[in-house]
Amino acid sequence: MRTHDDTWDIRTSVGATAVMVAAARAVETSKPEPLIRDPYARMLVTNANAGVIWEAMLDQEMVAKVEAIDAETAATVEHMRSYQAVRTNFFDTYFADAVAAGIRQVVILASGLDSRAYRLDWPAGTTVYEIDQPQVLAYKSATLAENGVTPAAERREVAIDLRQDWPSALRAAGFDPSARTAWLAEGLLMYLPAEAQDRLFTQIGELSCAGSRIAAETAGNHADERREQMRERFRKVAQTLGLEQTIDVHELIYHDPDRALLGQWLNEHGWRANAQNACDEMHRVGRWVEGVPMADDKQAYSEFVTAERL
């Protein structure tokens, strides 16, 4: 259960979800024709010791094992992996376009195990700020350093909870509000209540000069009944395979009916926004997975929103 002042490291609560996402990137990277390449994802998963269930996701045969128990759940697992690859690719492209337009200041909110500061081709003079819980940032930087991995841009950690005064901490780390910025909120908004989401984007707007850009993944809107059905099916599959569920992701997410539509909100607050439904993006890049239970419900899918400050 979430509280207003809860905290975590890489093995617990919201922190452990970053391991799940990195596992999906590692699986995608190992494919013959990967949509994205993250050579550091696997080491970030295996060194986290966040639980057997996350490391099991690295197993290429996992979907086959799940399929023998529950075909729809297997399709959902494969869908989740594909979704993470599509999402990563979309935001990688966003950053490539931003730096091509001359932006040299990047802020990744709730960066988790995001390795873009290390794996993307950043132009000289680019500074990447990563904001997250202190223990999460410490784990990532230490693990990569111990394995001889160095950033491809100037990387600055801002170790603070986004519910605290992160704008002041960001400025103290050297952030320049007068310089155009490329912001990213990926895998974040579903862990915020509606009012916190509005406050976050208000703060971003206050720190963004004209020409700045933002990209964000919105929270999907699964029907309560369907969400509970899938939750129970995942639990049974994990139990059958002998995988201990160290966290329940559903308990970490805020299912808030009053949440603003992000694209619309940004258009009303000094940005020019566009939104791409994740379902459509998966079809566009050829990564749609057939047989998922929510295939007929576009509202169940997140949107990838991009916007430019006017």
UniProtKB/Swiss-Prot annotation:
Q: Which InterPro entries did the record assign?
A: Ppm1/Ppm2/Tcmp, SAM-dependent_MTases_sf, SAM_mthyl_Trfase_ML2640-like
Check the record and name the Pfam families matching this protein: LCM
GO terms in the biological process aspect are: methylation
Q: What is its EC number?
A: 2.1.1.-
Gene3D superfamilies with a match to the protein in the record: Vaccinia Virus protein VP39
Please indicate if the UniProt record lists Transferase as a keyword: yes
Q: What class of enzyme is it?
A: transferase
Residues annotated to bind S-adenosyl-L-methionine: 132, 161-162
GO MF annotations in UniProt: methyltransferase activity
Q: What are the UniProt keywords, alphabetically? A: Methyltransferase, S-adenosyl-L-methionine, Transferase
Record family assignment: Belongs to the UPF0677 family.
List the NCBIfam families: mthyl_TIGR00027
Chain's role: Exhibits S-adenosyl-L-methionine-dependent methyltransferase activity.
What protein does this entry describe?
Putative S-adenosyl-L-methionine-dependent methyltransferase MMAR_0357
Species of the source: Mycobacterium marinum (strain ATCC BAA-535 / M)
